[in-house]
Amino acid sequence: MLEVTLPGEGTPPAEGFRTLHSLKRDLERYFRGYPVDFDDVPVRINVSGKPREVLELVREIPYGTVVTYGDIAQKANTHPRVVGVSLARNRVPIIVACHRVVAADGLGGFRWGLEWKRRLLELEGALPSRR
């Protein structure tokens, strides 16, 4: 459904190395708590319709920001459950930052477990207060 697209056939080896090196460096910085924008990482979204629209909208959520499933659903003109199902299929969760989508009354779900979602949001300084 999703994959990070790295340089392939016909790409000069040095360019591919720079891409991998850059992604590795950005991930290291991210996990050290530095704001990192992954917008320039090429991602192939191999779905269509609402799931694709949802994932594209989630890619636009800035570092340190959270939005609700309902917010994304409203923008995509769909149901919040469609948003949740679409995000559960995300295979590149730091690049397509589905952890930044939360429930109106708490964290909501996360394919890799709520503890990881909580850690990622804490890292970004975006953990919602308990209601």
From Swiss-Prot:
It comes from the Archaea. Coiled coil: none annotated. Its main location: cytoplasm. It catalyses: a 6-O-methyl-2'-deoxyguanosine in DNA + L-cysteinyl-[protein] = S-methyl-L-cysteinyl-[protein] + a 2'-deoxyguanosine in DNA; a 4-O-methyl-thymidine in DNA + L-cysteinyl-[protein] = a thymidine in DNA + S-methyl-L-cysteinyl-[protein]. GO terms for cellular component: cytoplasm. It is found in: Cytoplasm. One of its GO terms (molecular function) is methylated-DNA-[protein]-cysteine S-methyltransferase activity. One of its GO terms (biological process) is methylation. Its EC number is 2.1.1.63. Keywords: Cytoplasm, DNA damage, DNA repair, Methyltransferase, Transferase. The active site is at residue 98. It is an enzyme of class 2 (transferase). InterPro entries: MethylDNA_cys_MeTrfase_DNA-bd, MethylDNA_cys_MeTrfase_DNAb, WH-like_DNA-bd_sf. This enzyme catalyzes only one turnover and therefore is not strictly catalytic. According to one definition, an enzyme is a biocatalyst that acts repeatedly and over many reaction cycles. Involved in the cellular defense against the biological effects of O6-methylguanine (O6-MeG) and O4-methylthymine (O4-MeT) in DNA. Repairs the methylated nucleobase in DNA by stoichiometrically transferring the methyl group to a cysteine residue in the enzyme. This is a suicide reaction: the enzyme is irreversibly inactivated. Belongs to the MGMT family. This is Methylated-DNA--protein-cysteine methyltransferase.
